[in-house]
């Protein structure tokens, strides 16, 4: 919606050369539980001239509606389902402690892992698909980061990978997370 509602090249917004002044109202029809875009203020695009992938966050870009029907994800390959689950888990990345928020995040992570395991055996399990879809939405609407600082380094690192290569975002996150976690462990 930013490219339609703002003068100039939309890439100027994503590369931080200017702020968006408006956004064409957008909606979402979920076909994969992953990034939580349906309840997020963030969006990501890839500039194919240089293969650079960047995100932009602004409340103007929030979806005005979302269709969330778990049945639309039944035919999703299990690989993509697992990539989506990894993506969801990577949004629980606060750097500071706050017990209530941490417990909400913990419950969502347990649910994501539990329901992903169910879907590996039963891809058309409505409740597992619905739970994964709802966890995706809640993971990226700032419920689990409200008032806390977050570390988005893994996403920034992965954007460099999937900007240049045909890699699913969740697979790229899974590849970089372990090294990043070891690097920041003592901080």
Describe each region flagged by the PLM:
Residues 1-71:
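Glycine/threonine-rich beta-strand-loop-alpha-helix active-site module
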Residues 2, 144-145, 163, 182:
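Short, well-ordered alpha-helices that flank and scaffold nucleotide-derived cofactor binding pockets
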Residues 42-149:
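Carboxylate- and glycine-rich phosphate/diphosphate-binding segment that chelates Mg2+/Mn2+
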Residues 75-76, 147, 160-167:
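A short glycine/serine-rich beta->alpha loop
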Residues 109, 133-137, 160, 177-182:
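A short beta-alpha structural unit
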Residues 140-141, 155, 159, 175:
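Feature representing long, continuous alpha-helical segments
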Residues 161-187:
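Gly/Pro-rich interdomain helix-loop hinge
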